[in-house]
Swiss-Prot record:
Coiled coil: none annotated. Residues 1-42, 384-416, 584-812 are annotated as: Disordered. One of its GO terms (biological process) is mRNA processing. The gene is gpch-1. Belongs to the GPATCH1 family. Residues 29-40, 586-609, 669-720 have a biased composition (Basic and acidic residues). Residues 761-794 have a biased composition (Basic residues). Residues 145-191 form the G-patch domain. This is G patch domain-containing protein 1 homolog. PROSITE patterns: G_PATCH (PS50174). It comes from the Eukaryota. The lineage of its organism: Eukaryota, Metazoa, Ecdysozoa, Nematoda, Chromadorea. Signal peptide: none annotated. GO terms for molecular function: RNA binding. Residues 610-630, 653-668, 800-812 have a biased composition (Acidic residues).
Length: 812
């Protein structure tokens, strides 16, 4: 029968092929089921399908794996200490509902009215009222740490529940009641520790809280819950469980499958509140616990005071007293007319005398330059002028000589004898009108400071002599004018350069000490050393010569005269001194420099000739030279005869030896005299040659100076005709000495001369740089040519070697 005919309406169901279907009717077992996550991926992998999935598609953390943490530390921001947790190594699935469980923030009973406070009954809660908002905030926030006093007591050994003080109370505490067992325990305890001392028990003092509002006694504010929602009562108390809420993480992470139920924990059925920790025996009397002792106080109130205070009545204010102070101004109109005119033109000292004050000079007052503070004077100090006036009034005045002697020998520095001695010499020099030189044991800075202090200690008469002394200390002429004149005068006079110069006493002492090999203070030399400014700054020491540009030991350094007398330096000196700097003056300087260079060359030649002569004499007789240098004036040496030495050392034979010795001495004296005569003749010849050369140089310089003067006179006549040229500086002969010859050229200013010098220096530098570049380019070209030639030689040698090898092969 055909079934298709039976389906008149709709679509017919397909036939189930029971034979072809392979679906088993048995349910799948638990170990065969596959646990999947939210996304349908397999949750467990690995050994026996018991491990978690390995994160992002079987990787750890992310695509790249764990991202390493960066550690950074600096001075401003120190590196934080990273504390690792188990959650740092877990994936999102481990923290989900199948993992360690969700975390939720829960309220605890530590702060404010939480769950623990709500679970309490009405009679278990605090009796204090929380009607005000401030009290509610105080209850919410509680101090975490105790006060400083409690912490100090705990560190000293105090524990809560015990009294404060020494453990000096001996008493028998009845523990466990009056039973036989308790008595036996107390007897055994007394045998073990008979001298045991019990500390005082702390009796709590109940603090009374004052009522702040207008409510009655025992009033409590309304709670948030209404009366209808109140669930507290006897039934809730009976059903109240002692279980506490679990902390932190819920659920288990390991050991339990996803399709299994969790076993009951053994440790969650019991609570510590179910155990009794008291040691009291059941049925014991509670009277002993109710007994309280009196507080032992170490302070007692004394009825009488040992030193009672005295209280004084306040001063009475007069009835006419006014709080505002109004000074009465001085009425100048009442002064006489003469005094009014004199007051306008008064000096500081005159004003001090007029007002009756002590005579104080500007040095004693101490201006901005003085570093030492002025000494404050009291009204009880007896002044020297007042003492003199009193003595004169009484008629017993001292003589002028005694007074002068007392002022000269006055002691201003009793604690410093060296400074007092210098002050005494300073006074002696000032009274004579001479400047006191700088002591050798003081630096420039120290002497300037001490000099100001000495000047402040002078009297008015002595201070009046200071300007004259200071004017004498200054040079008569400025260095720019005096230096060329000094050079001209030095060129006219010549020093002796022969070997007959007398050696000073110091040099003689040094030579004698060197011969005796006694090296020490006599053979030493002392020089002034100028340190660098940077060195003094590094050692944090004041510079001994402030403001000086010299560095090192100038006495041992070679002076470069050419560098000193450069045109730029000459212009700089004249600019600082304010002298007229003209082209004529520069020409004069150039001529002087040329003459000085010629003189230096001649002196070098002369010294070389002297050295050659000395070498010849040294070869002849070195001992005779030393004796002749010590005695250049042909004086006989006071020397003991040879017979005296022979008699001491045992080499003499009598009269024959004396005669022979006398003959030898006469022959030696004749030889010495001949040598001295030869030396004198040589010296005379040299002097004549030197004098001739110097006369020629002088004549030549004089001619040049005359020519310059004639040229200057011609230029002056032309300048008088020309009105366009202006004279910048006109100096008098009295202020700067004889005037310089006028120049015909237009006068150059200081800045123009310096600019010209700078241009010349720049041109020289450019020329040097160009020359160096040319040299470098030539060297580079030469090196390139050499390299090319070497390459050619190497290639040619290689070709030759190849040809030779071919030839050898052909021969073979």
């Amino acid at each position: 029968m055909n079934r298709k005919k039976l389906a008149a309406y709709g679509q017919e169901f397909e036939d189930d092929d029971e034979e072809g279907s392979s679906v088993s009717k048995k349910p799948t077992q638990i170990h065969e089921e596959i646990a999947t996550d939210e996304k349908g991926k397999r949750r467990f992998h690995g050994a026996f399908t018991g491990g978690f999935s390995a994160g992002y598609w079987n990787t750890v953390g992310s695509k790249q794996g764990w991202v390493p943490q960066v550690f950074s530390s600096s001075r401003n921001e120190r590196g934080e200490q990273i504390k690792q947790r188990a959650e740092d190594f877990m994936d999102a699935e481990d923290l989900g509902e199948y993992g360690i469980g969700n975390r939720s923030i829960k309220q605890t009973a530590a702060f404010g009215e939480g769950a623990g406070q709500k679970r309490k009954m009405a009679w278990e809660r605090d009796t204090t009222s929380i009607s005000t908002i401030t009290q509610m905030f105080e209850d919410v926030v509680k101090p975490v740490s105790n006060s400083i006093g409690v912490r100090m007591l705990r560190s000293m050994g105090w524990r809560e529940g015990r009294g404060i003080g020494l453990a000096n109370v001996k008493q028998k505490q009845k523990r466990g009641g009056e039973s036989s067992e308790a008595q036996f325990d107390r007897e055994q305890a007394s045998k073990v520790a008979p001298a045991y001392e019990f500390s005082n028990e702390d009796a709590l003092v109940k603090q009374l809280t004052p009522l702040t509002g207008t409510h009655g006694i025992g009033y409590q504010g309304l709670r948030k819950t209404t009366v209808l929602n109140e669930s507290y009562g006897r039934t809730t108390l009976a059903l109240k469980s002692g279980k506490k809420n679990s902390k932190g993480i819920k659920g288990q992470a390991f050991g339990v499958g996803a399709f299994e139920e969790e076993d009951e924990s053994v440790y969650s059925n019991y609570d510590l509140s179910q155990f009794d920790f008291s040691l009291d025996v059941a049925g014991a009397s509670e009277e002993s616990n109710l007994k309280t002792q009196k507080l032992v106080t170490a302070f007692e109130l004394q009825p009488k005071r040992l030193n009672p205070r005295k209280f004084y009545a306040p001063p009475r204010v007069p009835p006419n007293f006014r709080g505002d102070h109004r000074p009465i101004p001085m009425d100048i109109s009442k002064l006489p007319q003469m005094m009014k005119n004199d007051v306008k033109h008064m000096n500081a000292e005159q004003r001090a005398k007029f007002l009756g004050e002590d005579r104080v000079n500007a040095l004693e007052i101490g201006g901005k330059s003085s570093k030492k503070p002025t000494e404050r004077r009291s009204r009880w100090d007896i002044k020297a002028n007042e003492v003199e006036k009193r003595d004169n009034e009484r008629g017993g005045g001292e003589a002028e000589e005694d007074r002068d002697r007392r002022q000269r020998n006055r002691i201003e520095f009793p604690d410093e004898p060296m400074r007092q001695a210098r002050f005494k010499e300073f006074l002696h020099y000032i009274r004579r009108g001479l400047p006191y030189p700088q002591p050798t044991d003081l630096t420039v800075w120290e002497w300037e400071w001490e000099k100001k202090e000495f000047e402040s200690k002078l009297t008015s008469d002595e201070r009046g002599m200071l300007p004259e002394v200071q004017s004498r200390a200054q040079p008569l002429a400025k260095t720019a004018i005096a230096a060329p004149i000094h050079e001209m005068m030095a060129s006219k006079f010549v020093k002796e350069a022969g070997g007959d110069l007398k050696v000073g006493t110091k040099d003689e002492d040094k030579l004698a000490a060197v011969k005796m090999e006694m090296f020490g203070e006599k053979t030493r030399q002392s020089f002034d050393w100028y340190p660098d400014n940077l060195l003094a700054k590094r050692f944090n020491v004041p510079h001994p010569y402030p403001g000086s540009d010299t560095v090192g030991v100038p006495a041992l350094q070679k002076t470069d005269w050419k560098r000193k007398d450069r045109l730029a330096d000459i212009g700089g000196v004249s600019a600082t001194l304010g002298l007229p700097n003209t082209a004529n003056e520069i020409e004069m300087r150039e001529r002087l420099l040329k003459s000085r260079a010629q003189r230096g060359a001649e002196e070098k030649k002369r010294n070389q000739s002297d050295d050659d002569d000395e070498k010849e004499y040294d070869d002849k007789d070195s001992d005779e030279e030393e004796e002749n240098e010590a005695e250049p004036n042909n004086q006989k040496v006071d020397k003991a005869p040879k017979s005296f030495f022979d008699f001491i050392f045992g080499d003499g034979d009598g009269a024959d030896s004396d005669e022979s010795n006398s003959e030898d001495e006469e022959a030696e004296e004749k030889e010495r005299q001949e040598i001295l005569k030869k030396r004198e003749e040589d010296l005379k010849r040299r002097r004549e040659i030197v004098e001739k050369k110097e006369e020629e140089n002088r004549k030549r310089v004089e001619k040049e100076l005359k020519e310059l003067e004639n040229r200057d006179l011609l230029r002056v006549s032309k300048q008088q005709e020309d009105d366009d040229i202006q004279i910048i500086d006109e100096t008098s002969a009295s202020s700067f000495g004889p005037a310089l010859p006028p120049s015909s050229k237009p006068v150059l200013s200081k800045t123009e001369v310096l600019k010209l010098l700078e241009k010349n220096m720049k041109k020289k530098k450019k020329d040097k740089k160009e020359k160096e570049k040319k040299k470098k380019s030539k060297k580079s070209k030469k090196s390139k040519k050499e390299k090319k030639t070497k390459r050619k030689h190497s290639s040619s040698s290689a070709d030759d070697s190849g040809d030779n090898s071919d030839g050898w092969e052909e021969k073979k």
